[in-house]
Amino acid sequence: ASTVEYDTYEQPDGYFTMQIPKGWAVQTGGDFISYIIDVYDPAQPQREIYIQLCGTGFQSAEGAALAQNYNASGETLFVMPEATTLSYFEGWYQGLGGSFQLLETLGGEADNALLYGKATLPNGTQTEGVYSAVVSSLEYNYGINLSMTMGQNVRVLTTAPGELDAWLPTLSACADSIQFSELFQNKRAENWSQVLGTSASLSASWNAMTDQMMARWEARIRQ
């Protein structure tokens, strides 16, 4: 990882730019609220930077089952019983057909934690990584529990087991380099206003997130 060369990636619609290791692939998805950036090494896909600006899950299986009846898009509906960072990732991986195991909480509160863990992907592949998300609860009960868990600024930085120490600085630097354009931020604010009746913008500081992540990780190594 110390000899990594970088390219500047420019999203074709002008939504963002970022630095990525030379030869890595970038995929994007979601709408302006849930926007996803997935950066990975085609030769070693466990090396991955996954960013999602907003993701949600239902706090009850009954709520998810009811919503599935109206889920015309065919998207996976996750069950995340608690509004915590750990519950978010446990529910996310389980919904994808895998699993998540917490190894250590590196810092933060339960709803805004920095986690060190390992995951099993649906195909059985093992990964090791650092995970963070700012999580809140959207309360809604109407006979059954339709409350939702919402994760914002979701960040997943992973490698094959045993590689994280070598690769985390590179993964963090790339995630930190993301620059969203004014065009994207304006479109996202418009979407938030339509959905929630309020305005929202990208308030997270990527620099602050990366500084915290690396400081916590280095403190763990020194122990």
Protein language model regions, located:
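Soluble non-cytosolic domains of exported or imported proteins
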Residues: 11-18, 83, 161, 165-169
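Proline-anchored loop/turn motifs at beta-strand termini and strand-loop-strand connectors
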Residues: 13-31, 175-181
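Conserved polar/disulfide-associated segments of primarily extracytoplasmic proteins
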Residues: 29-154, 159-163, 201-223
